[in-house]
Amino acid sequence: MVEKQITQSLNRTVFPKILRNKEQKENTVVFAYILLFSLFLLRIMMLSKEERNMNKEGVKIVTIGGGSSYTPELMEGFIKRYDELPIREIWLCDIEDGKEKLEIVGKMAQRMWDASPYDVKVHLTLDRREALPGADFVTTQFRVGLLNARIKDERIPFSYGMLGQETNGAGGMFKALRTIPVILSIVEDMKELCPDAWLINFTNPSGMVTESVMKYGKWDKVIGLCNVPVGAMMDEPKTIGKTLDQLTYKFAGLNHFHWHKVYDEHGHEVTKDIINAMYEGKDMGIPANIHDIPFFKEQLLRMNMIPCGYHRYYYREEEMLAHGLKEYNDPNVGTRGQQVQQTEHELFELYKDPNLDHKPEQLAKRGGAHYSDAACETIASIYANKLSHIVVTTKNNGAVPDLPVDCAVEVSSYIGSTGARPIAFGPLEPAERGWVQCMKNMELCVEEAAVTGDYGTLLQAFIINPQIVAGTKAKRIMDELLIAHKKYLPQFADTIARLEEEGVTIKDDVARELTEKGL
């Protein structure tokens, strides 16, 4: 902008005077070269401190939740993009309870770099404040309470006949309650130790966590990510004989609650072609953690948009709940969290192999596969100002006019050195508008409750959540979850003490046993 203003000013003043003087015409070319060189120097001077440091020294990455089973995918993505994202060092951070996994994953991560042509050191720490100073990018992929907390999030609602799921319904709200205070404390550390860094969040529920960073953390350099759009864009094109390069995707909505349209290389909409392909048994990129029951075709053709996989919990609620309850009641299967525990065990046994220096195929069994690759592309696009088209959670700014301009939405965006620039989607139809407005207001209540610890605000969120049948059972589920997660909900300490005095106990045997063991 400054360069443009300088050029316009010179066009109005200096150049006319030069050209009016015939004796100085020969100096015009020389002057122009001097001007261009000056503008180049001005651009260098205008580079922010963090840009100059990154370009000179390479990039420092800090990953909080570094002991995650997804970390090898993160390393793979960074190695693949090293030419455009020259990393000088990586720090993997975790907590004491995750120390063993951190050490296993850390050794594997270093093996992956050692097997590459690049000399990158992977540092491990249980103290994020040791890692954060000078960071250029901070990625977050942690789970407060580990998988045992997820199991309680699932089993307690199921014990009352309601959905128990990681990011939807009661479980999703309680995951946010545990996570938001932690992400805000991370932001406070970043303000002190790496104030110029970007925060790239893929800790679930990504939408509420990212929005809380912006709203309550007052931190604008944040982008939230999800693997669901990535999976759709990887698998849908081939169902109509196209490649992703030939198609343009437009997403709009919220994290785990968005829709998209698709256009071909000629600008013609092909959304209905993909919808028709959905009913021919073709792979549509549905995440591994979602039961694949088909949507009603008539509904999709009417909306002329493709819902994300998580919409099955809303559009086919009856069938999805029945499937979840069937697994919950089968001791040989268990909830998704219990299944993931087994998958995680298998993955970490693989990661221990001193000869393994690449991401194993078994990682695809985890529902969050491709999260990390999306994060690497986002970071590379910010660093190199690539203006890549990526679906992210960012500030709305009018992209979805049915929602407040300052709320967080998950939309198609161009990602560059200034962050995410959301692409306008336009108004939604009445049915989708009603859904998304209800979900957004539920999210806002959850975020407020996470920060304030207000019981009434949380109850409001429970009552308006479409996955919860409002009434006595809903309140009981909420109370049991508060007791189950006492260790991670200090903001609700007074409420939890009251519930314990009233004799509230946990109905589900597994969840109760985990709680009694302090897990």
What residues fall within each predicted segment?
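Long, compositionally biased stretches enriched for glycine and/or charged residues
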Residues: 241-519
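Hydrophobic alpha-helical signal peptides and transmembrane signal-/tail-anchor segments
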Residues: 30-43
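A structured beta-alpha segment of the ubiquitous adenosine-cofactor-binding alpha/beta core
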Residues: 111-136, 144, 163-169, 179-194
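Glycine-rich phosphate-binding loop and adjoining beta1-alpha1-beta2 segment
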Residues: 83-116
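Short, solvent-exposed beta-strand-terminating loops
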Residues: 137-157
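Rossmann-fold NAD(P)-binding glycine/threonine-rich loop
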Residues: 152-194, 198-215
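Rossmann-fold dinucleotide-binding core
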Residues: 72, 198, 202-267
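N-terminal Rossmann-like dinucleotide-binding module
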Residues: 60-86, 90-93
